[in-house]
Amino acid sequence: TVLSPLTAFADAEEQELNIAIFQGGYGDAYWNQMVELFEESHEGVKVNMTISPTIGDIIRPQIVAGNVPDFICLNDGGEDGVILSLIKEHALLNLNDVFDGENYAGTGTLRDDITDGILASSKCAPYGDGDIYLAPFNSGPQGLIYNKTFFDENNLEVPKTWDEFFALGDKVKDIDGRALFTYQGIYPGYMEEMLWPAIANECGEEALTKIANYEEGSFNNEGVLKALSHIKEIADKGYLLEGTVGMNHTESQTEMMLGKAAFITNGTWMENEMQDAPREDGFEFAMAPIPTENADDVH
């Protein structure tokens, strides 16, 4: 999520803009290009960018000391908790004017370019009043990454249901001993890519809204508990790659690419992030949706 306490700098003179950026799997090249273009189009403004995979830990003491960056790009679900703290403290600037302003192409407002429902969600409008305080900084699918070559060579079908998912775990173990699943261990936030779709499938988007709003009892209902039971079954029945919980993101992703596990949760950035990582022969990235209860359920 991106949050920004900035307005237009068209008339700025000799001003400095301090920005703090999370460096994820997409790399830093596009951020460097944006900084260059911004400085070219805003004469007199110098952009000081701090970019790091651990940017939350870097800026937390600065924020506590009252030295808050002008612009922050950081995952709202990060283990550092920075974004959640800023939301709780009502420390974010209202961004309605940004999205009601003209889009880059000059064909309408920026709001018109955003997929319906995103800006109204609790991710962007955390106080439920319709006002936007956080903005999405990228858009792309997330799901189960797997090696298409391995599936094709062994005539394996991508599982659509949870029953098929666990049955596949038995098949791949028999083929070459690989586990069904791994995840980014010490960064369990990646598991939300499996958790939230599973809950939405069981009991709808309303359940996610209740959870996001910390409503009492939001987890204690049959549908949510059923979704959680599927994820628990991965560990309880031996489908999780041994050692997963102690790995970081690149370690677990490498293990999966080496053929130690059939699936890992991730997004489209993994291909770029792991471009130089070792892998099993013929490895080809592919992505599948999270399993559903029934094969004809809508994702």
Residue ranges and their predicted role:
Residues 80-141, 194, 286-288:
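Hinge/lid segment of periplasmic solute-binding proteins
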Residues 83-85, 194, 201-203, 229-299:
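Extracytoplasmic/periplasmic substrate-binding proteins
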Residues 1-18, 40:
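Short, low-complexity disordered leader/linker segments with a strong preference
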Residues 13-24, 45-50, 71, 133:
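Short, well-ordered beta-strand elements
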